[in-house]
């Protein structure tokens, strides 16, 4: 159901999302909202007892971050260097199944009567709990309470506590706890952002076993040659005799518990679930590892896992919580967004954060530049150890990036536009491989990480390789063009705005490449002086010559940086201003998003933007532009930006804040803050918009909080919205933890952890010391 009026869907509460009635019409959407994940395992909010509703009103998804199948990318008319192999994150076995039968009648929300229904996502304690009072078709009434946890502490573990109580009868009840490996990915959508390129079932069951209350299966992919084990164990908590039976299915296992239930007595089945994959562990040890995991969990007990979850989240919220007083909707929205970011992010250096997190298979589970530019800052300034893992992920892809550059005839490394673990998976090169700016985006994230943490060891041991290989690439990609005054030009590229493709001198790309080249030159020279042995080691490994480093500086110094004297703005690229200008107001509302209604040739023909391009550059390299320049470019590009990308509104909110367009700043912030929670685009059923969620944090901290990070300096120019009474957030920077609190009366900075530090409040320099409030 489209939420065209943008009305709130869930009651406003600080720490929970509450669903108060079950409806077929909203079920699909709610499966995304009530997803639980831990950066490794993701379980959509489907019901333990399964769902018998109509087709296309549910998708039962369980995902393991980075676990994928490969497939050939088929082109009717291919070409050299086209991406050949696709990767798709797989929907793996559903292990959360607990069916309930009462005297042979199946507990099913689409049968009988629902007398009471409530489902709660508790973001402080990290669980989903569902309470149902249900009357069977023959009049038996029972109360059911189901609590689910995907452990943030134990990445391979999930647990469910399923409690039932007969209200008006005594009779036979049966729990059926199962693993169902007969699964596939969504592939019936015409929206390229949603469907999968994998057709039908791709996982083959190669081993399975069930004994007593315990069972497991092992499944293997057909082409990527990965396997995984899923194991379950069950504990019945009841003062009652029970009988256990079980069965092996073609692609799964069932554990059946039968008992006599008395009226008014509660019976609980606790289920412990574990997944291990051959991507990370020896294939022959997967079952043993999964069984060991659930054995430990069973011995510790469900309550221990609950307690661990709350403690983990308590630590997270101490750093990451943003407090807003004066708008309960936004308070709930930003916490929901941050909670899902934490759930979605890989923390092992081998995985990243997919565009849809672990809530759905949209975009095939691929990682994009979103994680480097939009998502990285949230973790960098709240949980820097997670930011480090994201940068390490890029280092671990470096060999694949080198191979891609070589394939395309270039030196150095070219990172894939979309991938899971290395190869380019974007089949549409004009909005894929041509977005070379991803190289500089990754370096920008690396640079920010090093500046914010002082982790020079990471830079010298790992990051410098990324830096030098990407600089090599830029110097090789560009050329000195006589008719451009012998400036260094980068031609035939696509910038962040995907509604303009294959252009010369995209401003964002050129400025970011210049930054990349300059940083590489500076770090190479710094390493020569400060850590000569480490420099020699990396120079030898990369066969790096001094003349290359000089060439980087020359390219950076001579970089062509577009500017229009006539309009006094930065043109998006060499051709952009020579196209017909069309404003968003001129396009009928039913034509959005344009990519689903217009041929790309028609889109490329106009001055029309999917998302900020020049304006994103101005945000990322804010110190290079005056406020007047920012305003002129904002005024030019805003009317022609469709915001068809969920990445768009947050940047517009931040910049509008600085310019003084306070109403626009708030409007754009509202577009991003509850985009998924209120299902603004009628597509949250397909999964969250992870980068937009991170953009919410940026819109608060960089927008209303006015935080800018210049080289080794924290600046604040806060502006509390008139709708709010208070805004409070924390920032981790260079080993310090700083609290920023805005009220209508004043702004207060407090150093909570670390050594004294100087910050800037507008143009005023302030020395913060621990224990002092300024």
Curated annotation (Swiss-Prot):
Record-annotated active site: 498 (proton donor)
Superkingdom of source: Bacteria
Physiological role: Catalyzes the reversible phosphorolytic cleavage of trehalose. Phosphorolysis is specific for trehalose, but D-xylose, D-galactose, L-arabinose, D-fucose, L-fucose, D-glucosamine and 2-deoxy D-glucose can act as substitutes for D-glucose in the synthetic reaction.
GO molecular function, one term: alpha,alpha-trehalose phosphorylase activity
Assembly notes: Homodimer.
Pathway annotation from the record: Glycan degradation; trehalose degradation
Pfam families: Glyco_hydro_65C, Glyco_hydro_65m, Glyco_hydro_65N
Name under which the protein is recorded: Alpha,alpha-trehalose phosphorylase
Influence of temperature on activity: Optimum temperature is 70 degrees Celsius.
Catalytic activity of the protein: alpha,alpha-trehalose + phosphate = beta-D-glucose 1-phosphate + D-glucose
Family under the similarity heading: Belongs to the glycosyl hydrolase 65 family.
Summary of activators and inhibitors of this protein: Inhibited by Cu(2+), Hg(2+), Mg(2+), Mn(2+), Pb(2+) and Zn(2+).
Organism of derivation: Thermoanaerobacter brockii
Biological process per Gene Ontology, one example term: trehalose catabolic process
Entry's pH dependence statement: Optimum pH is 7.0-7.5 for phosphorolysis, and 6.0-7.0 for synthetic reaction.
UniProt-listed Enzyme Commission number(s): 2.4.1.64
Root EC class: transferase
UniProt KW keywords: Glycosyltransferase, Transferase
Chain sites annotated for binding substrate: 369-370, 610-611
